[in-house]
Amino acid sequence: MSEFWLISAPGDKENLQALERMNTVTSKSNLSYNTKFAIPDFKVGTLDSLVGLSDELGKLDTFAESLIRRMAQSVVEVMEDSKGKVQEHLLANGVDLTSFVTHFEWDMAKYPVKQPLVSVVDTIAKQLAQIEMDLKSRTAAYNTLKTNLENLEKKSMGNLFTRTLSDIVSKEDFVLDSEYLVTLLVIVPKPNYSQWQKTYESLSDMVVPRSTKLITEDKEGGLFTVTLFRKVIEDFKTKAKENKFTVREFYYDEKEIEREREEMARLLSDKKQQYQTSCVALKKGSSTFPDHKVKVTPLGNPDRPAAGQTDRERESEGEGEGPLLRWLKVNFSEAFIAWIHIKALRVFVESVLRYGLPVNFQAVLLQPHKKSSTKRLREVLNSVFRHLDEVAATSILDASVEIPGLQLNNQDYFPYVYFHIDLSLLD
């Protein structure tokens, strides 16, 4: 499953034993894979400031998740015919999202823990706001390009009455630069081909004999040329209409046709450059983080390997990719990493608010093995940690019991700190 539960309990002896009981039960019952989730010590400040920060982090969490989902969808749209490979591009620091979450390590360089918590949160908020602003401008430019290209493509996909003719006709099909003669294009229904050949010369005076030629046809009819004197154009149009022949209003302008062809070629080139299908396939299965080793303490599977890549490897894999796809990959990674740091901050703040000072709690990441086991997993957690809040635990088991002074829906409150992480970003 791509679902994770991030929980915390006090770090005293009694609750560490409760965590061990939880791990034993969930392991034996095959309910979840559990991993300790390392969160550094932050400058706490006042409890009042933490209350305000808790609300701000909740909003930032929602915003960050929305942003990475939009970015994931943008990758889908850019890749178009290669949608099956989208997941390979949605990485965090060069590894798949599940590996990054289960091997999470706080980025001390990017978010120094010596700063006040409010400063750390502000740094993340500004980073995400900038990514969103860039995303809007880049996707707007791409969508404009895509729309312009689609409009041009529609012109070449209609029937003979509406489609552009610049890719069909050629200079040789027309009498050009003549003071007296002009070549018209006439759409003739397929059942009327024979009638056209027999009658076009007599539809009006001054039609050049044997001047008709079939240029192209679709399932409904054909496009024929006919050359005549300019002064009988209107008379010819009238007679043609009476015989179910339609004169297509078109005059060969070499410069205009060349301009239209160049515009189509330019748009196709610009769109292709945003995502090139020749991009190098992403490598999988690398087992080291080069510049900073991933340090994890698995509760359920101590032999589970960490995965990672060097920055140089990630850069080499980006060769051949268009600028928009490359930007989306890099900034999706940045936004996702920021999002998981927000989760860590929320656990820290809520744990201090709920368990008090001095700071002493243990965070654990649980990955339910299957959807059908989540109800049983929740029952195990509520049973193991019910001592943390007897009133809340009782109300969870009995929905009719209200918690005095607690405004949350009882179904959203648990005796332990709990946050949900959903990695199903393309659903």
From Swiss-Prot:
Pfam families: V-ATPase_C. GO terms for cellular component: cytosol; extracellular exosome; lysosomal membrane; vacuolar proton-transporting V-type ATPase, V1 domain. Keywords: Hydrogen ion transport, Ion transport, Transport. Kidney and placenta. One of its GO terms (molecular function) is proton-transporting ATPase activity, rotational mechanism. GO terms for biological process: positive regulation of Wnt signaling pathway; regulation of macroautophagy. Residues 292-319 are annotated as: Disordered. Signal peptide: none annotated. InterPro entries: ATPase_V1-cplx_csu, Vac_ATP_synth_c_sf. Belongs to the V-ATPase C subunit family. Subunit of the V1 complex of vacuolar(H+)-ATPase (V-ATPase), a multisubunit enzyme composed of a peripheral complex (V1) that hydrolyzes ATP and a membrane integral complex (V0) that translocates protons. V-ATPase is responsible for acidifying and maintaining the pH of intracellular compartments and in some cell types, is targeted to the plasma membrane, where it is responsible for acidifying the extracellular environment. Subunit C is necessary for the assembly of the catalytic sector of the enzyme and is likely to have a specific function in its catalytic activity. V-ATPase is a heteromultimeric enzyme made up of two complexes: the ATP-hydrolytic V1 complex and the proton translocation V0 complex. The V1 complex consists of three catalytic AB heterodimers that form a heterohexamer, three peripheral stalks each consisting of EG heterodimers, one central rotor including subunits D and F, and the regulatory subunits C and H. The proton translocation complex V0 consists of the proton transport subunit a, a ring of proteolipid subunits c9c'', rotary subunit d, subunits e and f, and the accessory subunits ATP6AP1/Ac45 and ATP6AP2/PRR. This is V-type proton ATPase subunit C 2. The gene is ATP6V1C2.
